[in-house]
């Protein structure tokens, strides 16, 4: 692939992915994808939220595998040093934008949110006296938040003044009713007239006993809902940053990695096809001849296939991980692009402006880093 085409892909793949998500929503194709989204799912918890770790692990293993090999030249070593500098800059930017600028100082995305009027809400009940559907966005998170709020209010209940005792009783009773109800979104003991007062009381008590909740992490930890200001999309930022890093470093070693993969393509084909040669029916058919007993046939058809399949899978995994980790890198890259598409489709979590601010925040640094090192990124 020519340098110009790779530059175009590197520059446009993330914005085009977001645009495709918007078009899917506009033409009604995004509803099915939105129904499958789960912010508390295993994929989101173990893969997406730890995305920079997985990206760092795979990216650096590829850099080491294809550059720090026996017989590496001085140019290879310079490429590794340059990759480390780029990675360090992107890691610092990821941390200060999403985790925190300094001890006790929130990340940039939270500072933007607070500066634009956002804060940690506790609008637990809506005007109809029901648990607010927009409070946490899912039943699981809502129940977890209600349990946290209930624990804090119960712990500090003896500190209430006499005139607040009635509100405390109402709040505790309403939350208990929501947690214990079969339909937690419609507790019977919350009235419309009391909902606003209860929300205000919960908000004041949580901020009083838990301190100023000025970061999204603190707000989530104590059962609040981050709302009211401009909240740059952390998912868009992270997915874009990871894609830009993987594509940028792939340009350095991609030609060597793909050439190595092409040279050993038939070995990979044999390892893959070996996985399909271990089924019971196939094994039974290979047990032809009259000299084999029925017990031996059953042993070979039932016991041997899973053992043989596991051994073949282990050999394939070892071959990919040790000899061709670029396959893992490309798989991870597709995964992050898919997550970016899902984030663009999930318009209920962020506005278009918030998506764009997350996208631009990632491009500010990655664009400068890879534009500055454009000469050093010539594929080798």
Swiss-Prot record:
Protein name: Acyl-coenzyme A diphosphatase SCS3
Function, as annotated: Fatty acyl-coenzyme A (CoA) diphosphatase that hydrolyzes fatty acyl-CoA to yield acyl-4'-phosphopantetheine and adenosine 3',5'-bisphosphate. Preferentially hydrolyzes unsaturated long-chain acyl-CoA substrates in the endoplasmic reticulum (ER) lumen. This catalytic activity is required for maintaining ER structure and for lipid droplets (LDs) biogenesis, which are lipid storage organelles involved in maintaining lipid and energy homeostasis. May directly bind to diacylglycerol (DAGs) and triacylglycerol, which is also important for LD biogenesis.
Impact reported for residue 354 to K/V: Inositol auxotrophy. Impaired ER morphology and aberrant lipid droplet (LD) budding
GO biological process, one term: phospholipid biosynthetic process
Similarity comment: family membership: Belongs to the FIT family. Fungal FIT2B/SCS3 subfamily.
Organism this protein belongs to: Saccharomyces cerevisiae (strain ATCC 204508 / S288c)
A Gene Ontology term for the protein's cellular component: endoplasmic reticulum lumen
Gene designation per UniProt: SCS3
Note: Present with 538 molecules/cell in log phase SD medium.
């Amino acid at each position: 692939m020519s340098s110009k085409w790779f530059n175009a892909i590197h520059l446009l793949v993330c914005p085009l992915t977001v645009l495709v998500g918007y078009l899917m929503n506009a033409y009604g194709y995004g509803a099915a994808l939105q129904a499958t989204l789960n912010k508390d799912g295993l994929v989101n918890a173990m893969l997406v939220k730890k995305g920079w770790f997985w990206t760092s692990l795979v990216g650096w293993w590829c850099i080491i595998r294809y550059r720090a090999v026996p017989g590496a030249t001085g140019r290879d070593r310079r490429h590794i040093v340059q990759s480390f500098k780029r990675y360090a800059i992107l890691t610092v930017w990821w941390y200060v934008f999403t985790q925190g600028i300094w001890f006790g100082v929130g990340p940039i995305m939270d500072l933007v949110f607070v500066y634009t009027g956002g804060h940690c809400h506790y609008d637990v009940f809506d005007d109809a006296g029901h648990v607010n559907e927009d409070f946490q966005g899912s039943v699981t998170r809502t129940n977890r938040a209600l349990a946290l709020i209930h624990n804090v209010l119960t712990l500090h209940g003896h500190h209430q003044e006499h005139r607040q005792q009635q509100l405390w009783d109402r709040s505790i009773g309403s939350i208990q009713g929501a947690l214990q109800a079969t339909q937690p979104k419609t507790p019977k003991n919350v009235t419309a007239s009391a909902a606003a007062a209860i929300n205000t009381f919960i908000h004041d008590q949580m901020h009083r006993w838990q301190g100023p909740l000025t970061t999204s992490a603190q707000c989530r930890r104590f059962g609040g809902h981050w709302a009211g200001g401009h909240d740059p999309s952390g998912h868009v930022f992270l997915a874009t940053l990871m894609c830009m890093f993987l594509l940028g470093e792939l340009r350095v070693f991609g030609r060597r990695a793909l050439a190595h993969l092409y040279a050993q393509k038939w070995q990979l084909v044999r390892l893959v096809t070996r996985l399909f040669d271990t089924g019971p029916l196939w094994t039974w058919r290979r047990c032809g001849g009259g000299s084999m007993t029925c017990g031996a046939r059953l042993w070979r058809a039932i016991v041997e296939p899973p053992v043989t399949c596991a051994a073949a899978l282990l050999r394939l995994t070892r071959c990919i991980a040790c000899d061709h980790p670029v396959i893992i890198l490309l798989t991870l890259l597709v995964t992050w692009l898919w997550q970016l598409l899902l984030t663009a489709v999930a318009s209920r979590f962020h506005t278009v402006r918030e998506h764009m601010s997350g996208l631009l925040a990632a491009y500010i640094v990655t664009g400068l880093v890879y534009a500055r090192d454009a000469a050093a990124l010539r594929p080798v």
